[in-house]
Amino acid sequence: MDSAAKDIMGKIAAELDQEMVDWIGRQKIFFVASAPLAESGHINLSPKGGDTLRVLSPNVVVYQDFTGSGIETMAHIRENGRLVIMFCAFEGAPQIIRLYGQGEVVTPKHKDFADLAQLFPQKAGVRSYIRLKADRVTSSCGFGVPFYSYVGERDVLDKWCVQKGPEALEEYRQMKNRQSIDGLPGWE
């Protein structure tokens, strides 16, 4: 086992330290998990990528949420706030970092939307920002995570959003994102 792996195994903290923040900044993909309160509800796990996440403080991160075919994360946060974000190393030393906490949906109607928008490259199709206040930060070994080579970002969603334009995107959200697959309120 290399020394970098020894130093990161099994940490539990209330917030991110600078080493974790730097490591998160180098990751090309992260995963977001949420669930409804209902026992029969569907758990959701979504991959995210690109330059879409910022660490705002040792226990607050935010990511861009784009128009898409689903609205599960937003609906679950609105119902119960629970959210987990996971990062894992696909290159270099193995590591997994999970951020557990309460999520908040910041839509264009929210007072913080414009300020958060300034933190990111502007792209068509931004539906909201998802802000997570973490109350538990864990790292684990990641020894079972395979190596993958990063090839590049996909531009399909961005091109689709640009082609649709703002009005058609809002119509799409009203048609496809009004509620989750379990019937929870989504886009308003």
Put a short name on every predicted segment.
Residues M1-E188:
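Binding-site signature for planar aromatic cofactors or substrates
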